[in-house]
Regions:
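Cysteine-centered nucleophilic/redox motifs
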Residues: 66-92, 111, 220
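A generic structural signal for short
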Residues: 65-66, 246
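Residues at alpha-helix termini
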Residues: 12, 83, 263-264
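Residue-level "edge-of-site" marker
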Residues: 23, 94, 275
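Short secondary-structure transition/capping segments
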Residues: 54, 101-104, 282
Length: 282
């Protein structure tokens, strides 16, 4: 990413260029990204190709002012942070599902970010409702955040009996890490750094498999200025207050749905997105 691209990205999220890669600047960038770049899976249902290459991600997030899912959002954010002087590594995660079962390999992409003081942080702007600020990767106690109470712990065996190790060459002694929110496991991270291209298979699976929740539903969601959340799921708009109270409404017309995409998320689809049926082309 060149300086002009970085400046355009910073304008996209309404942030000033930090003078140094500090944790304070990282917190501000993380929060502004969550407020301005929506977590959304519209490309899957609009028949748009998802390509995990830096230039393509920048074109989508910055040039076309869209959002994306974890691979796109954290991939693009990681490129920005690198351009701003942070040391960034891509980490592969597996999301916890029903009965504590872990998802597929490369199920999730998150970032390990090293700040100027040498501290390592977990930055994740691509997991929907999650921490508003980066989490310390060195801290094993509770970390209080507007998004909940989080813990980062060394992983034990999963329900299948697989131990939480990432293999030779991994950081943190080779141990996988579990990320918990309000006492419940969210995802498991390998600590071995990966390349963006490594996540191509995971992105393809989530974009095509009938078992992926991304192919079965529509979502467009962002953090609000007051710390709540605004989510458009198909035609249902849910407003979540900072205290967790929810209000829902369903627009009556296509024009109202398109206006919500435009006014609340900055997205201008030509038609109202609908869940793409299996085998449907174009």
């Amino acid at each position: 990413m060149n300086p002009s691209q970085a400046d355009a990205y910073l304008r996209r999220i309404g942030a000033a260029r930090p003078q140094h890669p500090t944790v304070e600047a990282l917190r501000e960038l993380h929060l502004r990204h969550l407020r301005t770049v929506p977590f959304e899976n519209l490309s899957i249902h609009l028949g748009e190709e998802i390509v995990l290459e830096e230039e393509r991600l920048l074109d989508k997030v910055v040039g076309r002012r869209r959002g994306g899912f974890c691979y796109e959002l954290n991939g693009a954010f990681g490129a920005l942070l690198t351009a701003l002087g942070y040391e960034v590594e891509l980490l592969a995660g597996r999301v916890y599902g029903d009965e504590g079962r872990l998802g597929i390999p490369y199920d999730h992409l998150a970032l390990r970010v090293r700040t100027a003081d040498g501290a390592d942080w977990l930055a994740d702007v691509g997991f929907g409702a999650h921490s508003h600020f980066p989490l310390s990767l060195a801290e094993r106690g509770e970390q209080t955040d507007p998004g909940g109470t989080f813990r980062v712990t060394e992983a034990g065996p999963d329900p299948a009996g697989v131990t939480g190790t990432a293999g030779p060459g991994s950081a943190a002694g080779g141990a996988d890490l579990d990320v918990l929110r309000n006492g419940g496991p969210q995802y498991r991270l390998e600590t071995r750094p990966r390349a963006l291209a490594d996540f191509t298979g995971g992105a393809w699976w989530h974009s095509t498999s009938p078992r992926s929740h991304f192919t079965r539903s529509l979502v467009c969601s962002r953090l609000t200025e007051d710390g709540g959340r605004l989510t458009l799921s198909g035609r249902v708009l849910t407003t979540t207050a900072p205290d967790g109270r929810k209000e829902t409404r369903e627009p009556a017309t296509d024009e109202e749905v398109l206006a919500l995409y435009r006014e609340e998320f900055g997205i201008e689809p030509a038609v109202v997105p609908t869940v793409r049926q299996r085998g449907q082309v174009g």
